[in-house]
Amino acid sequence: MNWQQRSLAAIIGVVVAIGSLAAQSTGTVSGTVTLTSASREPVGTAAYGRRGVAPKPAAVGPETRKVVVFLEGVKPSAPPAPMRAKITQRGEQFLPAVTAVTVGSIVDFPNEDPFFHNVFSLSRVRTFDLGRYPSGESRERSFPRAGIVKVYCDIHSQMSALIMVLEHPWFTIPAESGTFTLPPAPPGEYTLVAWHERIGEQRQRIRVTAGGTTRAAFTLPVLESQP
């Protein structure tokens, strides 16, 4: 082994050691989000008539992709790295409907429909108007402040999307199955939040331990029960 090979091996060893140390000094937060809807079958026997509805898992598919799971009130020691996200205009919809990014991130808005769109927001966190632009064109905006930004199309009133801008990187959007895992978090006690624009939010107190895994489960009612 020559000196170059030895130097490369030493560098790889340092990188592996740093990665191992980082993993040992942070913890994993993972879990599930379950959305429930109202069953139309009555609860109880026929002798007492209909007394309400029983919640059951909702086959809502992508609705879980409209949930944001995050640690609440966390102040990182350094500003989080900005991200690059994309919200596509396709089929007269914004895809995805919900996006979460860190402060300072840039979001691209490509138009994949064969007609014009005009993306805008009147949210105080970030007000903008991208103007009308045709198919195949993309425009972007940065998001320097934390908060919730609601996005619309000035041409197609049914189109809407939501961007949650956070001051730290410890957040995620669950998979369609409802499973989620946050980026590795420093040890400590936190409030974990599962948020949905229409449903509201649920909170859980959790403890993150170095090198450990903290699990949480949320159940959110996606539909109101019908009398």
PLM feature spans:
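Bacterial N-terminal signal peptides
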Residues: 9-20
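Bacterial N-terminal signal peptides that target proteins for export
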Residues: 1-11
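Extracytoplasmic copper-binding redox domains, predominantly the cupredoxin/blue-copper superfamily
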Residues: 24-227
